[in-house]
Amino acid sequence: MNKPVSISRTYPRLAVYSQENFRGLRRVYRGNLGIADIDAVLTGIESLRFFSTNPNATLVLFDRSRFRDNFFILRGNRSIRELDDILRRGDVESLIATNQRLTAAQVRRIQRTGNLPPGYRLI
């Protein structure tokens, strides 16, 4: 008699690549997290894929490290071929990926304090 199998998946799933167009080295992260310095991961992230079953999942891109300065909020699944083309004023230097809907006020609080909400991993 076969036993039922239970599979648990953690969202969101963030796949980051060291080169544009989803090439080069790849690393996959799961769960709510913040990457404080993109250059410290794979010697720089050039493209990414963000996936969640929640349409309100949020990806926040910052143009300075440690979640500072200007930010851009994206909702839902995203495939970004060239990360540095997203922000008009500069390169993406840090990001937050979460399965929750982050409001602009919550992002400004993170920006002001430099601290992620409870339960988030800091990379």
Can you name each region flagged by the protein language model?
Residues M1-I123:
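Compact beta-sheet-dominated domain cores in extracellular/mature segments
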